[in-house]
Amino acid sequence: FRSRTDMANHQSDQLNVTGQATGDFKIFVTDTGASPAAGDSLTLVTTGGGDAAFTLGNAGGVVDIGTYEYTLLDNGNHSWSLAENRAQITPSTTDVLNMAAAQPLVFDAELDTVRERLGSVKGVNYDTAMWSSAINTRNNVTTDAGAGFEQTLTGLTLGIDSRFSREETSTIRGLFFGYSHSDIGFDRGGKGNVDSYTLGAYAGWEHQNGAYVDGVVKVDRFANTIHCKMSNGATAFGDYNSNGAGAHVESGFRWVDGLWSVRPYLAFTGFTTDGQDYTLSNGMRADVGNTRILRAEAGTAVSYHMDLQNGTTLEP
């Protein structure tokens, strides 16, 4: 049997058997992204008695309805109702969560290129220089909510900066812009993409005794595309744009011993995005709130200075 169901408006086809019913039967219900009120259930089958058994014929015995998967529940009085399974959110829901979680990872990957630039020019004398840095990283993310994804991120950052030296100190001031593209594969099927355009500024102060302070500010424009795989195998898609902004402050001390340098540091990073509302093609309405992240970090960077015969300098 096939049932047209609109849980959000409490409407559905119903199978009413006035007499005794015997046998095993399956009910097929169409998936939808529209969310009903929490805890809603809807009676689909009633019989006048007998040993009939009705189960949901959809793949896995579940149907996607809004945020949660629904199953066919035997009420014990010769009736069966469609009821939500709050233990399992739908694949579409996990994919929406995944897209929101991917943007801070994009921000961090882009920020790292500027942090690397500031680290590489410490103790280096120059006037003005242009630089570039490629991004090629992969992230695997899992969450307690049942959402998970793999992100492959590639991109390029271009920048220009100048160094101003004084008797005991020097400062660096620079600007940068960049682009990155993320391919995201969702653990429960489907995929997404994030195209990021970033612009920012940075500055650094360094004392000849090795003490330093660095700062970075940047803004991002994210173009997001999402293709969800529903439990029935169908695809729901959507797209939206969002904006992000963040800042990073780092302070530490740089010791140099011959060609080796050791740099312990303490850093703080903040990032936020604006909230966005969008609707998937299956009717699911996603209300994505502001993402806010504040992170403290302590670590040590160790590097070795190498001058190659062709004049190239490496410092891994």
What are these regions (language model features)?
Residues F1-L42, A296, V302:
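Extracellular beta-strand/loop-rich repeat segments of large surface/secreted proteins
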Residues R4-T5, D40-G48, F54-Q151:
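Interface/linker segment at the passenger-translocator junction
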Residues F25-T30, G48, F54-L56, D195, ...:
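A broad "ordered helical/assembly scaffold" signature
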Residues R4-D6, L73-G76, I89-L97, V124-A129, ...:
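Membrane translocator/pore-forming domains, dominated by Gram-negative outer-membrane beta-barrels
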Residues L15, I27-F28, V45, F54-L56, ...:
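Generic preference for hydrophobic/aromatic residues in regular secondary structure cores
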Residues S12-Q14, T113-L118, T157-I160:
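Short alpha-helical segments and helix-capping/turn motifs at coil-helix boundaries
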